[in-house]
């Protein structure tokens, strides 16, 4: 028996869902009873969540890069101090 990788299975399932959705639309059936306001609220919520996640991620990355928080970083700081290379 052939085994399929995870990506192939996911793409196939999504293709089937898209085909079923398109067929239902062609037959005049609404596959999902969603109001436009609900879509707008979801888009706003996703934008806000993405914005918060991006801000937190970039803040933590900048903090980590600009501070000597690891053992290696502390050794680098001490070496810079010993050679008078810090401000």
UniProtKB/Swiss-Prot annotation:
It comes from the Bacteria. Keywords: Membrane, Transmembrane, Transmembrane helix. It holds the Pfam family Holin_SPP1. The chain crosses the membrane at residues 45-64. GO terms for cellular component: membrane. Its main location: membrane. It is a single-pass membrane protein. It is found in: Membrane. Belongs to the SPP1 holin family. Involved in cell lysis upon induction of PbsX. This is Holin. It comes from Bacillus subtilis (strain 168).
């Amino acid at each position: 028996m052939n085994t399929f990788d995870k990506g192939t299975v996911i793409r196939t399932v999504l293709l089937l869902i898209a085909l079923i959705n398109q067929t239902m639309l062609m037959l005049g059936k609404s596959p999902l009873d969603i109001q436009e306001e609900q879509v707008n609220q979801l888009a706003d919520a996703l934008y806000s969540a993405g914005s918060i996640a991006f801000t937190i991620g970039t803040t933590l990355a900048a903090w980590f890069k600009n501070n000597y928080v690891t053992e290696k970083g502390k050794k680098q700081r001490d070496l810079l101090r010993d050679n008078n290379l810090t401000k």
